[in-house]
């Protein structure tokens, strides 16, 4: 149903946000920013 679609989208967005935050953290830790 539509709720499954919404859940899927939210999961995807959450993964993307978490991934970009992790990348920023790695960048700062390695001093490459």
Swiss-Prot record:
Cell compartment(s), UniProt: Secreted
Tissue specificity comment: Expressed by the skin glands.
Taxonomic superkingdom: Eukaryota
Location, primary (coarse class): secreted
UniProt function note: Antimicrobial peptide. A mixture of Brevinin-2DYc/2DYd is active against the Gram-positive bacterium S.aureus (MIC=15 uM) and the Gram-negative bacterium E.coli (MIC=15 uM).
GO cellular component term of the entry, any: extracellular region
Single GO biological process annotation from the record: defense response to bacterium
Any Pfam family the entry gives: Antimicrobial_2
Keyword terms of this UniProt record: Amphibian defense peptide, Antibiotic, Antimicrobial, Disulfide bond, Secreted
Organism for this UniProt entry: Rana dybowskii (Dybovsky's frog)
UniProt similarity note: Belongs to the frog skin active peptide (FSAP) family. Brevinin subfamily.
Name under which the protein is recorded: Brevinin-2DYd
Disulfide partners: 27-33
């Amino acid at each position: 149903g539509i709720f499954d679609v919404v859940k899927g989208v939210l999961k995807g967005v959450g993964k993307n946000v978490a991934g970009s935050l992790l990348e920023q953290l790695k960048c700062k830790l390695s001093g490459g920013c």
